[in-house]
Structure formats: structure tokens, C-alpha cells
């Protein structure tokens, strides 16, 4: 992840440097397409294979920048994809304050439109995830701890709609690619009827993290059916009540230390029945402790449809 951000930083600086040149020559004397080899070289230095089959053009309103069409990329076995249109821009007021030393990205915007992205392995022993019709916009992007916003949408699996928006603060060492600190606030996301909100604060490449995440009441049956369209083995049995698992919500908080003790506390609301789950992970000895508690839980609605007991 750090290498990808580092590559985006350097590539963005290279492209935004073209903006300065373009303004100096009133844009007419410079064709940004002539700089494709330099952009590919900057990507290759970060182990990213880049193909630029489309046109590069200037953008003037509402901000000045560069628009790149038909981008293909591959970053080893981590991610690959195609981007219909990528734009990098900077506000007019910040245009002449750009630091071209590579240490800081100027205040500006990054927009990705109509992309297809394959995430090969989000975590060990997981399956690839493909994001289709991926669109995203980042405003006032910064790697020095200043706050910026992000909005994104995509379709995953068989049309499962994802939407996300949040405010972030990101402090990254651009020399090593290490994320020293990241703060996510005002997180709002939706996944096919399930709405999520929360916040996160992490340090040292997520070695230490604290945060919380909660959902609305959503129809778990419908969500599993949608996922099952792509993964037939993912399905729920027919239960005694057709309303079982149609009003589910959860509220979770966590405090993790990958070199010490991590704690997770979750309250599940399953059709108005409350279950509390408290767990601890001792990473030093690879032990998991878990306690599940609740006043009572009526199982009659969740038994097999033909069960008489």
C-alpha cells in the first residue's frame, strides 16, 4: 500500500509539473502526450507497470490540471486494472506554490472515473476481489497530516453496490512508504442496504489502531442472497420464520496492538435479541479469548423450516 501511495505521489507531482510548464507556455506550445515516457518511468520506479493508450489533455475549470484517458496498470501481484479517465488538478491559488522536490503533494484533487480494479489478495488466504464501475474523488489530498476528503462508489461480486465517504488525515514517510499515522473520521458507507458509520485512528503501518464501527438495521437474508449470486456456496438455510435475520445490526469497538494485546467488543442485535461478544487476542503467545453473553435467545425462528422441535 505504501508503494502505491508513493507512486501516486511521484506520478502526481510529475503530471502537475506539466501544469506549470503549460501555463508558462500558455498551453499552446506543450503537448502533455510528449511526457508519456517520463510518466511511465516514474511508475516503473515504484514497481508499477503503466500503459497509457489514451490521450493526455489540459483541464482549466474549476481547477487546472491534467486529464489522462485509458490507463492500464499492474502492481505485481497486489492490484491491476483499467481506468477510463484519471484527472489530477490543483487550485489556481496553489498553482505557484507547488513544491517539485517530491516531498509534498500540493493541495488539489484526484478523480478516477469508470475504472475496473482487481485486488489480488487483501489478506492472506483470501480470494481476489474485483471492483467494477469504480469512481472516486479525493479533495485537498495531503500526506503531511492535513485533512482531506474522499468519496467512492463501485460494484463488487454480482452487482453489490458499495458507496463510501470519509474525512482523512494521513502522515506518510515518502522515503520509506511507511504510514506513520492515519485518522479516519465521519466515515459513512453503504453495502446493498447495510449502512455503516465509524472512525479509526492508526499508527506505524496499522501496528496500533483504535476505532469503532456500527451499522443500521439491515436485512441479512437479502445481503447473503446478493453475495450468493457470485458465490453459490454462500447461502442461508430455509428457517422456520421468513422474518428471521431480517433486522440485524451491530456496534463494535476495537483497540489493537499487533505486538501486544488487542481487544474487540461487539454488540449484536438479531431481530431485537441482544448478544454481547468480548474478545482478546494476545499476539505474543497467539491466543484468542472470547466471551459471548446475553439474557436469552429464542431459537425457534432460526430452526430448519421442517423442524418440529
What are these regions (language model features)?
Residues 297-308:
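Soluble, acidic/polar mature domains that operate outside membranes
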Residues 126-128, 228-232, 306-308:
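Flexible, surface-exposed loop regions and adjacent strand-edge segments
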Residues 79, 106-108, 207-209, 262, ...:
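Outer-envelope beta-barrel architecture signal
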Residues 102-209, 215-218:
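Elongated, acidic membrane-bridging lipid-handling scaffolds
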